[in-house]
Amino acid sequence: MNAEISKIYTDGACSGNPGPGGWGVVVYFGDGSVHEMGGAAAATTNNRMEMQAAIAALEFCQAAGHPPVILYTDSEYVKKGITEWLPGWKRKGWKTAQGKPVLNQDLWQVLDQLNTKSVNWQYVRGHSGNAGNERCDAIARAFAAGRQPELRQSRDL
């Protein structure tokens, strides 16, 4: 029997903005097992990497068939974007309140498709000693620096 996902942490990093970037995800299961993921992009921004981490986390949940989930991000941009700003952007044809095109619309559209009412988006302050957030940050920074970190995958689907 598969254990339920208890919580997920996501983070993104970028060396220069834009510049080489990385993202990290740590999935914690109720049975104590962990699944870590990450990736890199050659020329990107911190916000895009934060969004890519959230997308990877939600795709993992969807593949695992494990809603609901608590998703922690240290990006206010991602948290507010998905929980507050997105409905207005869609109503205005993907324009901001100032009438400008929404940045990262391609990724917002993917996040919008993956997001469900069963996702509980939570903000966690970055670099505050939270173990899940710190581990995601280390994964994201390693990928941004061109290194392949050792990823714990005690639970594979």
UniProtKB/Swiss-Prot annotation:
Which cofactor does the UniProt annotation name?
A: Mg(2+)
Q: Which family does it belong to?
A: Belongs to the RNase H family.
Q: State its role.
A: Endonuclease that specifically degrades the RNA of RNA-DNA hybrids.
SUPFAM superfamilies to which the protein is assigned, alphabetical? Ribonuclease H-like
Q: How does this polypeptide assemble, per the annotation?
A: Monomer.
**What residues bind Mg(2+) 2, as annotated?**
D11, D137
**Cellular component terms (Gene Ontology):** cytoplasm
Per its UniProt record, what PROSITE patterns does this chain match? RNASE_H_1 (PS50879)
The UniProt entry, under CDD domains, shows:
RNase_HI_prokaryote_like
Name of the encoding gene? rnhA
Gene3D superfamilies, A to Z: Ribonuclease H-like superfamily/Ribonuclease H
- What Enzyme Commission number does this protein have? 3.1.26.4
InterPro entries attached to this UniProt entry: RNase_H, RNaseH-like_sf, RNaseH_domain, RNaseH_sf, RNaseHI
Keyword annotations for this protein?
Answer: Cytoplasm, Endonuclease, Hydrolase, Magnesium, Metal-binding, Nuclease
Q: Which domain of life is it from?
A: Bacteria
Q: Which NCBIfam families match?
A: PRK00203.1
Which organism is this entry from?
Cyanothece sp. (strain PCC 7425 / ATCC 29141)
Cofactor binding remark = Binds 1 Mg(2+) ion per subunit. May bind a second metal ion at a regulatory site, or after substrate binding.
Protein name, entry field:
Ribonuclease H
RNase H type-1 domain location: 2-145
What chemistry does it catalyse, as a reaction equation? Endonucleolytic cleavage to 5'-phosphomonoester
A single Gene Ontology molecular function, please?
Answer: nucleic acid binding
